[in-house]
């Protein structure tokens, strides 16, 4: 983008081949096949005489909790006076009201439970210091905001990540049940824990 020293990636998920590449699989069906395999795991009670040890390899593939680290690449540049004008934020659609950050990972948490949500909510740039969040009323991030307000808060604590691993983008947009953590799902897709700070 003219006038910026930061590259822009567009249409990263624009074909089946690009989606497979982003998810690290040969074919997109591989992801579904693996999920179906995990869903077939039997329920195990303490009274069940089944060989539990045989299930450990599959369980290790299925559950990769986030790994917390002290230092990460996202901490290498710290802007004390953030300026959105330094970032190439584009107006992509003819009817958009202005430039939007289109695929940000928006991290919020529920004030009562502390449960994390990672959603994909477009951010409209209003000026060099301000954005507006576009989330649908039925999304978990919106629930967290309503719960924050109900608890007496005026603002919700949020973090935004731009340019992350495409698996995180995919996980944040996946129609997961409310109790499934997007970062755990991303770990499942990547077959390793996602590093977080």
How would you name each of these model-derived features?
Residues 1-197:
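Extended, highly charged
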């Amino acid at each position: 983008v003219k006038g910026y020293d930061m590259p822009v990636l567009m249409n990263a998920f624009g074909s089946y081949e690009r989606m497979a590449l982003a998810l690290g699989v040969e074919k997109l069906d591989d992801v579904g096949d693996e999920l179906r395999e995990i869903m077939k795991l039997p329920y195990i009670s303490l009274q069940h005489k089944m060989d539990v040890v045989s299930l450990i390899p599959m369980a290790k593939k299925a559950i990769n909790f986030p790994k917390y680290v002290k230092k990460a690449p996202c901490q290498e540049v710290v802007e004390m006076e953030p300026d959105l004008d330094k970032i190439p934020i584009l107006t992509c659609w003819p009817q958009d009201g202005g430039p939007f950050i289109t695929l940000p990972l928006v991290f919020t948490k529920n004030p009562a439970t502390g449960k994390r949500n990672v959603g994909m909510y477009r951010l409209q740039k209003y000026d060099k210091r301000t954005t507006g969040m576009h989330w649908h009323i039925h999304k978990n991030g919106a629930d967290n905001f309503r719960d924050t307000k109900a608890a007496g808060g005026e603002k919700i604590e949020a973090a935004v990540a731009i340019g992350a691993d495409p698996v995180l983008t995919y996980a944040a947009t996946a129609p997961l049940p409310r109790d499934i953590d997007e970062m755990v799902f991303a770990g499942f897709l990547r077959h390793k824990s996602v590093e977080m700070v």
